[in-house]
């Protein structure tokens, strides 16, 4: 279970930072920054991947009420322009800036740090080790899932309500059948390939219709 040992080694306030959505073919990458309260930390915080959706939603609500939370969102078109690595770094930077308070130290999940002026420590597997990072993982994951569920209503053919933009079989089939949407990351190889195939199908069908 994540703990506060890393936080206690750092000057306060300490923010934990994590992201959700580096791997999907569609939708934004979302980062969250969380400064936990001195008292009243919600119980049950863990790596978001270990929690069911309902528990993530419950904890996210509690964290927004009890902790200081910042969220950074970088959309698909900017991911294509920057690449996913730099888009993730930007989302993390935006999340810390959105805290409304400058942390004395930042704990970041992973092995890379954004180019910012904050004293920071990267912790591999930090969402399973640091309570602040775990809290950020919950907020980032729930926030991104909520965004993708809203997009799913407008684009039901891609099955985003189930796959949240990841490369599930139904999503890949829909990409081939319908082509990419404006929310797809066209710099990602499966999306680029599907776009080329779809354009080819349209071209052939157009020639058939005109012939």
Residue ranges and their predicted role:
Residues 1-211:
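RNase H-like, Mg2+-dependent phosphodiesterase core
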